[in-house]
């Protein structure tokens, strides 16, 4: 299958590479010359522009940082035309960016008028899942379009869920990430309290992991350095899912909550804590570094 892939960041790059390795004919692009150079060295064909990727493509995939980037890509900005004016009718567009559900619906509605099918398919699983091809896709759009996309998604992920109409995938994603942000703060708070009282963080982590407080962070992503060798915490919080990305997703959750008048007090508090953590200079560190905000000074 001929696929255009736009966005070769920490997630998009490995996803595109998995499609290339699976035998699909790819043309990829990123605004970052370094990203293009990195994946070209791994054999990924790189186009000169986003517009150049879609020529002859049966499927267009985008993996971009925020709503504004997706809006600019498909609708254009200034004198530059958007991709919707270049993508032929009958093409399937898969947007795996995590953005506002309203933006996904806007793109899908405009595309439908041109005979272009669009699904929003944000992912969960982190960079490790992107590399291993074990991501979880949360899909919004027409169910028939998901079935068209399934052979492509299966080369990048292990779990594919149909959430509903356009924008539903985005809503599912921000619900998941709101819970993840809250969960990480709660886990960090408990560990910081235990350590402040002289407990060994490894022992406390195991106690909680095997008790009613057990959760994904304790199992896979412990925020305390030295407890879990594979977690970003033991690598000076490098890599993983950045604090600023978590802050963005929590912001999306609160915008959505306000739009539908849903009560999310813990989501709002989590957003405020991550905002404070980012302002303290930790925006580029993994989101589990929020434990620094909660630790007793001098501990």
List the predicted regions and their residue ranges.
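NAD(P)+-binding Rossmann beta1-loop-alpha1 motif at the extreme N-terminus of oxidoreductases
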Residues: 1-63, 91, 161-162
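Rossmann-fold dinucleotide-binding core
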Residues: 8, 98-177
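Hydrophobic beta-strand scaffold residues
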Residues: 26, 46, 117-119, 160, ...
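Rossmann-fold NAD(P) dinucleotide-binding segment
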Residues: 50-62, 66-117
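Helical "substrate-binding/catalytic lid" subdomain
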Residues: 169-269, 273-298
